[in-house]
């Protein structure tokens, strides 16, 4: 069958439903401790879904994406999001940078409130269970084996919180144990804190 064209649409029904009905129940938002005005760096922007939900909760999000193709798709999605009455105030809090996240973090002058890394794609077998946009996303990203280096770079910024989204089963912690975890059906969030005693 023909592959449907991949389009990033922040006005899409499913995403709007999650925005309207997820709220504090959205585990992602609990993991990043989402608050209005909070500065979040999303190191693995991908299709922008997580960044959009963070921005919808009031966070200011910098999206880092190293794939030029995905960055173009994201730029297009953000452009159309600025025209939608439901999404324009949300995407106004989203800034896209096409870059290598490790290099970008190495130049970061001021620690962020939260740095977010999504490790849901590495080492996952090609199967019928990975569909549509996700399949195409894997094609663009390839086998992303640099999560350990990315986590080390994120921790080196001295940001208040680093959150890594991993597969529930088989998601290696790269030898760096998190301070705590939040678990969902198919994934978990490993959370690293700069000052654990204050949380």
How should these model regions be labeled?
Residues 147-194:
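Conserved Class I SAM-dependent methyltransferase catalytic core
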Residues 43:
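Conserved beta-strand/loop positions that form the S-adenosyl-L-methionine
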Residues 1-40, 56, 60, 64-114, 198-199:
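S-adenosyl-L-methionine
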Residues 100, 104, 142-155:
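A short, acidic, amphipathic alpha-helical segment used as a generic capping/interface helix at domain edges
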Residues 47-59:
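Conserved SAM-binding loop of SAM-dependent methyltransferases across substrates and taxa
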Residues 38, 113, 160:
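Conserved acidic residues
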Residues 119-150:
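Mobile active-site "lid"/loop adjacent to the S-adenosyl-L-methionine
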């Amino acid at each position: 069958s023909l592959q449907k064209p991949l389009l990033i649409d922040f006005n899409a029904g499913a995403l709007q439903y999650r925005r309207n009905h997820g709220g504090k129940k959205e585990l992602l938002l609990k993991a990043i401790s989402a608050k209005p005005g909070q500065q979040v760096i999303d190191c693995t922007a991908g299709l922008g879904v997580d960044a959009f939900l963070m921005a919808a909760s009031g966070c200011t999000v910098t999206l880092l994406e190293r794939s030029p193709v995905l960055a173009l798709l994201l730029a297009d999605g953000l452009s159309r999001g600025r025209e939608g009455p439901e999404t324009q105030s949300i995407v106004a809090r989203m800034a896209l940078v096409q870059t290598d996240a490790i290099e970008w973090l190495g130049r970061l002058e001021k620690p962020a409130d939260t740095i977010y890394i999504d490790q849901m794609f590495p080492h996952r077998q090609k199967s019928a269970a990975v569909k549509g946009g996700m399949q195409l996303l894997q094609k663009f990203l390839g086998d992303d084996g640099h999560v350990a280096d990315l986590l080390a770079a994120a921790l080196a910024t001295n940001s208040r919180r680093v959150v890594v989204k991993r597969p529930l089963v088989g998601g290696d912690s790269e030898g760096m144990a998190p301070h705590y975890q939040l678990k969902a059906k198919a994934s978990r969030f490993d959370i690293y804190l700069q000052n654990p005693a204050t949380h």
